[in-house]
Amino acid sequence: MAPTIEHGLDGTTTEYHDMAVAGDEVERLLVELFSEHWAAITVGPLIEGAAYEIQFASPPKVTMLDGYLTVDTGAWHFHLCVNDHRGTRSEELRRIRRVARAAFFKTEGGSCAPAVWGLRLWNGRGEQMVTILFPNPHFDDNWQRLREPRWEKTELWQGLRGRYAHG
């Protein structure tokens, strides 16, 4: 599938590489991310007017129940409906709650960083559920700007995008 390009009001350009959301693809990807790569990612909704940039200090507990993935740090947790669930009789609510779109993305031209690499999920209403940011080659591990990009920091994003978005 060809990437989708979106141009933001802030002058950014985002290239989205969608992945299949049927079956357990999204579940498998998120279990891998939160179980194996938790120290490398930043998580939270990123919407106009609000940005939650949460990083993990220790490995979270990752569980599945009735289609919901729970990521639990002990002090706090969140749930994402990533698979079929039966928690409501309403077919419409089941459709709305479940991930309806998942896409790896690269955004260029922002005011905070020359580029950002991530994964974004939307529900059946088209509302953002979560954004997961991957290591950025323009910054060190303490978010200090590097003089020269370290392109190897995009390997996790590139590898997962290649496996899950098939390109």
Residue ranges and their predicted role:
Residues 1-167:
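Eukaryotic intrinsically disordered, low-complexity regulatory linkers and tails enriched in Ser/Thr/Pro
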